[in-house]
């Protein structure tokens, strides 16, 4: 008998299943749609030689790569924004802050928005802390580091480490962070996302 376990990050992370189930489980990570999967979900006819891939890619980048987005897109962008807002509220503002008992939600949200506005840039907890301090908000770099870990373990962001080709080893600082879905930039950055096209493409 197969048993499928899903749930809120506020109560259980997939990494804890190994302890609770004593290794008798298989973890399947489900990612948002790739561009090809997105087109398939929209039932696009690939045999059409006049297919406007540029317009379709624009939709993919500017809406959302989450599966539900293809179901509700005919209802308009407002519906997609409502859906993304609900995702953000549930996962970031509720699940993570509740699970880790984060009291300073303003500071946490500022870090999320800072990371979103700097996707594809080399970052460290220390320079994030310094930048926020210059903007009038003091957050210790160790707190920033914890918040980054929470966002990664909840699959909101992915971290890519730098690699020293000469020494053939990963470097411990100045990592890059990418959003699981660039559609979340609609919520986190609004119209400002337009100026970040290069990093958005890098994220994809």
Can you say where each PLM-predicted feature lies in the sequence?
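Loop/turn-to-beta-strand initiation segments
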Residues: 1-4
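Conserved beta-strand termini and adjacent loop/short-helix elements that scaffold enzyme active sites
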Residues: 6, 30, 160-162
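Interdomain motor-coupling "hinge/lid" segment immediately C-terminal to the ATP-binding subdomain
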Residues: 8-10, 14-122
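Accessory nucleic acid-recognition modules appended to NTPase machines
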Residues: 76-204
């Amino acid at each position: 008998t197969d048993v499928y376990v899903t749930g809120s990050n506020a109560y259980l992370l997939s990494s804890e299943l190994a302890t609770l189930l004593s290794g008798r489980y298989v973890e399947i990570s489900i990612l948002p749609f790739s561009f090809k999967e997105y087109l398939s979900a929209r039932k696009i006819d690939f045999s059409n030689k006049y297919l406007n891939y540029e317009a379709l890619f624009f939709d993919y980048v500017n809406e959302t790569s989450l599966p539900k987005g293809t179901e509700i897109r005919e209802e308009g962008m407002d519906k997609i924004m409502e859906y993304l807002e609900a995702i953000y509220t549930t996962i970031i503002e509720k699940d993570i802050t509740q699970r880790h008992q984060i009291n300073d939600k303003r500071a946490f949200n500022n870090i999320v928005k800072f990371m979103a506005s700097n996707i594809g840039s080399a970052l460290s907890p220390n320079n994030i802390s310094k930048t926020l301090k210059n903007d009038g908000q003091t957050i210790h770099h160790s707190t920033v580091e914890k918040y980054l870990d929470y966002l990664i373990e909840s699959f909101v962001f992915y971290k890519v480490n730098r690699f020293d080709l000469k020494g053939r080893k990963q470097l411990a600082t100045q990592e890059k962070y990418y959003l699981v879905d660039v559609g979340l930039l609609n919520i986190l950055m609004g119209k400002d996302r337009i100026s970040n096209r290069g990093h958005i493409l890098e994220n994809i």
